[in-house]
Amino acid sequence: MKRFSKFLAVVALLGLFSGCAEKYTELYNLTPDEWYAQVIADIKDGDLEAADKHYVSMASEHVASPLLEQILLILAQAHANDEEYLMANHYLDEYIKRYGDNGPKTEFAQYLKIKANFDSFTQPNRNQKLMEDSVTEIEKFLYMYPNTEYRPLIETMLIKFKLALYFLDMQIADLYNRTGRDVSAKIYEQKLEESPFRNSDLIKPDVAWYRKLFE
């Protein structure tokens, strides 16, 4: 009886795997236009996992298809809209690697990467280094593309990142003072003294997401 039960379990498992395999073998040898339509349909259905898999199939079957360039940007934006910012940046990095021209295409993709990082800070528990890296990336972007059409948006992001870091430094200094770590507190107090925001009339946020770092 036990052997029969095990046999049924194995058969059921094989049937499950067969069903899964059959599901994905349905989509092979499609034209670039058909793959493109399938990825768009996946995105519309909210199934980004399927969209990712179908993109991989499309890219492997049609390496030189001009539709790949567009679909990479579409997937990046879809993941950003779904707050999957790491995946968004993955596709943007792939876009730059494949189609970067050190001109408008690269500039646009780099802008989207910065925007994805900026949008990710609407979530709590983001780390200080990621903010500092974002400031560095923005300053590098502005140096590389001084006449960029995205300058107003980029500069707004830069100011907000720097403000967030300033308030975060205030929180860290306060934390160190309250826990008796005077040397560390003085380091952050010195940073605050040297900040261009020091004498600014700033409205302190009531509930700052970066407080979650210490909770």
Segments (PLM) and residue ranges:
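Sec-dependent bacterial lipoprotein signal peptides
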Residues: 1-20
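Bacterial Sec signal peptide processing site at the extreme N-terminus
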Residues: 14-38, 50-52
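Short solvent-exposed coil/turn linkers within tandem alpha-helical repeat scaffolds
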Residues: 61-67, 97-106, 125, 139-156, ...
